[in-house]
Amino acid sequence: MASHRPRSNKAANGASTSPKRSWIIVSAALVGFCALIAALDSIRSSFYIFDHKAIYKIASTAVANHPGNATAIFDDVLDNLRADPKLAPYINKNHFSDESEWMFNNAGGAMGSMFIIHASVTEYLIFFGTPVGTEGHTGRHTADDYFNILTGNQYAFPAGALKAEHYPAGSVHHLRRGTVKQYMMPEDGCWALELAQGWIPPMLPFGLADVLSSTLDLPTFGITVWITAREMVGNLLIGKF
């Protein structure tokens, strides 16, 4: 008759401690990752090259100089940015009149087009808007977002508000990090100089998800990924995080 040896206590203890050891390793790695993220987040502003107050001054001055003229305003804004030697190396070298640099953006139910002036890990600066109007969800983001209105009007409201916030040309709409609103650009059009400061990569899925789940506009997806990567990687290579 075959006999069965009882499993040794040593083997049993080894088997029981193995999952515990794995959980300890995973937990330690998770704590370390969270600590790293918290440390980086505490110094994120040290990576910024833009001052949102200076951007507002550039935008509002351009609006005052060329009221209602989007082309002249865009030129004025870019001329001022490129005239600053601290900013010029990090600005898109192409002109906004180059149609290949523009792309549609479908996000949160809204649709507009954008021109990327700057993109890096902690900041982006774009022209964004539409001449025909749109409305949608702002998204809940890992960055502060400053919409400097150049032409037209933007309206927004947070859940619970009974009246809309109104942002005319020359004003700035600050969407604070982690907050969310519905926003609308009327049918007569609106263009904005949008500055985001915080962690940009986590925002990218919001800006790209509609292409994959709804519009299936793969050429636009490709252009968006290519130009964003070109600017981000290019800036990383010259020391802009």
From Swiss-Prot:
Q: Which UniProt keywords apply?
A: Endoplasmic reticulum, Isomerase, Lipid biosynthesis, Lipid metabolism, Membrane, Steroid biosynthesis, Steroid metabolism, Sterol biosynthesis, Sterol metabolism, Transmembrane, Transmembrane helix
Is the keyword Transit peptide assigned to this protein?
Answer: no
Q: What class of enzyme is it?
A: isomerase
The EC number(s) given in the record are 5.-.-.-
List GO BP terms, alphabetically: ergosterol biosynthetic process
Name of a matching Pfam family: ERG2_Sigma1R
Where do transmembrane segments lie in this chain?
23-43
Superkingdom to which the source organism belongs: Eukaryota
Its GO CC terms? endoplasmic reticulum; endoplasmic reticulum membrane
Per the record, the pathway is: Steroid metabolism; ergosterol biosynthesis; ergosterol from zymosterol: step 2/5
Lipid biosynthesis recorded as keyword: yes
InterPro entries documented for this protein: ERG2_sigma1_rcpt-like
Topology relative to the membrane: Single-pass membrane protein
- Main localization, broad class: endoplasmic reticulum
**Which terms does the record give in the GO molecular function aspect?**
isomerase activity
Provide the protein's localization: Endoplasmic reticulum membrane
State the family named in the UniProt similarity comment for this chain.
Answer: Belongs to the ERG2 family.
Q: What is this protein called?
A: C-8 sterol isomerase
